[in-house]
Design a protein with these regions (language model features):
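Transcription factor C-terminal regulatory/effector domains that mediate ligand binding, dimerization
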Residues: 1-169
Length: 169
């Protein structure tokens, strides 16, 4: 049924995040502590970004603004910067729940979908519910918006009209 599909989709996001954790050189233990600081903010003499997939490489903001490492695992640089700059002004637990709470079927329309290699932004898609709820994260994320419509077109669905979704009250 549809609830199981959404649960599987969230499980895929969980898997994708874990793959991206490894791709940037961290372990899942690194993010378990609420007080963890991104590896990109710590002095790492042997650390090199050369081996990190392009979409996951740290931005200037990631390198200079201390933040929790969970933000580093999304392949959307502008969205990561937006989350870091927002600081404590948004409920990151609520966002995490929408993305990865595969055990909860109450709010199934608000999630991300991952269709391929997790480090490639072209393999991610957002649902309309996610776009409406978290639109402030998407206003400067054209790669995620383009990828979403590419996947919708692939399935024969109408593309989202972003100006309508992102400007709705």
């Amino acid at each position: 049924n549809r609830d199981h599909l959404i649960s599987l989709s969230r499980l895929n996001v969980h898997k994708a995040i874990n793959e991206n954790i490894r791709a940037v050189g961290m372990t899942s233990r690194w993010i378990q502590d609420d007080d963890s600081i991104s590896i990109f903010n710590l002095a790492q003499p042997s650390f090199s970004i050369e081996g990190i997939p392009l979409c996951l490489r740290p931005t200037f903001i990631q390198l200079h603004v201390p933040h929790h490492p969970w933000i580093d695992f999304f392949p959307f640089p502008r969205m990561r910067d937006c989350m870091i700059l927002a600081g404590d002004s948004f409920d990151d637990d609520d966002l995490c729940h929408d993305l990865m709470a595969f055990w909860d079927t109450r709010n199934t329309a608000t999630t991300l979908l991952v269709w391929g290699d997790s480090w490639d932004a072209k393999n991610w898609e957002i649902t309309e519910g996610f776009a409406q709820k978290w639109k402030w994260l998407l206003l400067d994320s054209p790669e995620l918006l383009a990828s979403t419509n590419r996947w919708r077109k692939f399935r024969g669905e109408k593309p989202f009209i972003w100006k309508d979704i992102l400007t709705e009250a």
